[in-house]
Amino acid sequence: MATSCFPPFSASSSSLCSSQFTPLLSCPRNTQICRKKRPVMASMHSENQKESNVCNRRSILFVGFSVLPLLNLRARALEGLSTDSQAQPQKEETEQTIQGSAGNPFVSLLNGLGVVGSGVLGSLYALARNEKAVSDATIESMKNKLKDKEDAFVSMKKQFESELLSEREDRNKLIRREGEERQALVNQLKSAKTTVISLGQELQNEKKLAEDLKFEIKGLQNDLMNTKEDKKKLQEELKEKLDLIQVLEEKITLLTTEIKDKEVSLRSNTSKLAEKESEVNSLSDMYQQSQDQLMNLTSEIKELKDEIQKRERELELKCVSEDNLNVQLNSLLLERDESKKELHAIQKEYSEFKSNSDEKVASDATLGEQEKRLHQLEEQLGTALSEASKNEVLIADLTREKENLRRMVDAELDNVNKLKQEIEVTQESLENSRSEVSDITVQLEQLRDLSSKLEREVSKLQMELEETRASLQRNIDETKHSSELLAAELTTTKELLKKTNEEMHTMSDELVAVSENRDSLQTELVNVYKKREHTRNELKQEKTIVRTLEEELKFLESQITREKELRKSLEDELEKATESLDEINRNVLALAEELELATSRNSSLEDEREVHRQSVSEQKQISQEAQENLEDAHSLVMKLGKERESLEKRAKKLEDEMAAAKGEILRLRSQINSVKAPVEDEEKVVAGEKEKVNVQQ
C-alpha cells in the first residue's frame, strides 16, 4: 500500500520528513524527562543511525494509513463541489488560490500528513508523559518506602545492640549475686554449725515441753469432746422442741383454717337462709297471686257458665228456627212439586195449543193466569232464598262463636295447666327448702360439735405451750451455764497459750546465745541438720495442732453466738405463739357467740317452717278445690264441644239441603225461561197475523 501510494519517495524526502518532525519531538512539554534521558538518546543515535531512518519510515507509513480516510473525505467534498459549482463561486476561488499556492500536490499532501502526524504524535506523547509521571510517582513512593525500611532496620540494629548490652550487664549482675549468695550460704553454714549443738539440747527440752503440751492437749480434746456431746444433746433437744413448735403451729394453722371454713360456711348458711326467706316471701306472694288467680278463675268460670246457658238458650231458639225452616223447606218442596206438575200441564196445553191454533185466544187467558202463578212462585222462591241466606249468616255467626268458645276454653285449659305447674314448682321449692333447713340443722349441730372440739384442743394447746415454755426456759438456763463454762475454759486455754509462746521466745533467745558461743562443731553438721529437720517437722505439727485448737475455739464461739440468736428467735416465736393463742381464744369466743345467734336463728327458722307448712297445707287444699272446679269446668266445656259438633253437623246438613234447593230453583227458572221464549214467539206470530187481517179488511 505504501509503495503504491508513495512511489517517488527517496532519501531527500525522508530527510525532509525527519527535518519536519524534529521540532515536534523537541517540544518543551516534559523537559525534565528529556534531560534525564539525554545520555541514553545520544548513545542510541551514535550506535544505530540506520534504525532511526527505519523508525522515520515506519512513522510515515503509519501516518499514511491514518490519512487514507481523510483523502476519501476530500474526494466526497470534491463531488459535492461539482454539483454545487453554480451556487458557490467563492469556494472555487479559494480552492484555486490554495492550488496556486501549493504548486505541487505532494507538498500539500506532506503538509497534511505532517499536521495529522503532529496531532497523533502529540496525543501519544501526552499519554507517554502521563505514564512516565505515574511511573515516577511510584518510583518515588518506593524510594520513600525503602528509606523508611532502612531507617527501621538501623533502629532495630541499635535496639538489638542495646538489648545485648543490657543482657550482658544482667548476666554479670546475676553472677555477682550468685557469688555473694554463695558467700552468705557459707557464712550461714558456719553459723549453723555453731547452733546445731545448742539445738540438740534445746530439742530435748522442747520434747519434754511438747509431751507436757500433748497431755494438756489430750485433756482439752477430752473436754472438747464432752462439750461437743453436750452440744449435740442440746441441739437434739432444740430440734425436738422446734419440731413440737412446728407441730403446734401446724395445728394452730389447721384450727385457723377450720375456723375460717366454718365462718365461711356460717356466712354461706346465713346467705342461704336469707335466700330461703326471700324464696318463702316470693312463695307467699305467689300463693297470694294464685289465690287471686283462682278467685278470678272462679268468677270467669261462673261467667262462662252464664254464657254457656245463654248459648244453650240461643241454640234452642236456633233449633226451633231450624225446625221452622225445615217446615218451610218442606212446604217449598211441595210447592215445587206442584209447580212441576203445573209445568207439565202447561207443556201439555202448549202442545195442544200448537195443535189447536183456534183455541189460542182461550189459551192466552190461561197463560196469563199461569204467568201470574209463575210470578208468585218466583216471589216465594226469592223469600225462601233470602231466608236461606239469613240462615247461612246465622250459621256462620254460630260457627264463629263456637270457635271463640273453643279458644276461650283452650286458654282456660292453658291457664289451668300453668297453675298446676306453678303449684308443682312451689311444692318442689318447699321440699327443697325443707331439705336445706334439715341440712342447715345438721351443719349447725356439726358446728357445735366442732366448737366443743376446738375448745378442748385449745385447752390442750395451752397446756402444751406452758410445758414447752418451761422446758425451753430450762434449756436456756442450761445453755447459759454451759456457755459460761466454755468461756472460762477458753480463757484458761488462752492464758496457757500465751505462757507457751513466752517460753518459746525465751528459748529462742537462749538458742541464739548458745549459737554465738559454739563454733567448733563442724563434724556433726549432717546429724544436726537431720535433727533440726525432725524438730522442725515436730514444731510444724505442734503449730498445726495449736491452729486446729484455735479454729475449734473460734467455731465454739460462733456456735455460742448462733445459740444466742436461736434463743432470741425462740423467744420471739414464743411471743408470737402466745399472741396467736390469744387471737384463737378471741375467735373461739366470737364463734361461741355466733353459734348462739345461729341457734336462735334456727329456732326462729323452725317456727317459720311450721308456719310455712301450715300455709302450704292450706294452699294444697285450695289447689285441690281449684283442681276440682277446673275439672268440672273442663267437663262442661267438653259437653259444650260435643253439642257444638252436633250443631255443626246439623248446619252442614241444612247447607247441603239449601244447596240442593238452590239447584232445583235454578232448574225451574231455566225451564220457565225456556217455556216463555216459544210463547213470546207465538204471540208475535199471532200479532202479525192480526195486523195482516186488519190490513186486508
Curated annotation (Swiss-Prot):
The chain crosses the membrane at residues 107-127. One of its GO terms (biological process) is starch biosynthetic process. GO terms for molecular function: DNA binding. Gene3D superfamilies: 1.10.287.1490. It is a single-pass membrane protein. Residues 81-100, 599-629 are annotated as: Disordered. Residues 80-106 are lumenal, thylakoid. Residues 203-671 form a coiled coil. Residues 1-41, 42-79 form a transit peptide. Phosphorylated in vitro by human casein kinase II. It is found in: Plastid, Chloroplast; Plastid, Chloroplast thylakoid membrane; Plastid, Chloroplast stroma, Chloroplast nucleoid; Nucleus. Residues 128-697 are stromal. Residues 616-627 have a biased composition (Polar residues). The keyword Lipid biosynthesis does not apply. Keywords: Chloroplast, Coiled coil, DNA-binding, Membrane, Nucleus, Plastid, Starch biosynthesis, Thylakoid, Transit peptide, Transmembrane, Transmembrane helix. Residues 604-615 have a biased composition (Basic and acidic residues). GO terms for cellular component: chloroplast nucleoid; chloroplast thylakoid membrane; nuclear matrix. The C-terminal part (439-697) is necessary for DNA-binding. Required for the initiation of starch granules biosynthesis in leaf chloroplasts. Anchored to the thylakoid membranes with its C-terminus facing into the stroma where it is essential for localizing PTST2 and SS4 to the stromal spaces between the thylakoid membranes in order to begin starch granule formation. Associated with leaf chloroplastic nucleoids in vivo. Binds to various chloroplastic double-stranded DNA fragments without particular sequence specificity in vitro. Interacts with MAF1. Interacts with PTST2; the interaction is essential for the initiation of starch granules biosynthesis in leaf chloroplasts, for the correct location of the process in the stromal spaces between the thylakoid membranes, and for the association of PTST2 with the thylakoid membranes. This is MAR-binding filament-like protein 1. The lineage of its organism: Eukaryota, Viridiplantae, Streptophyta, Embryophyta, Tracheophyta.
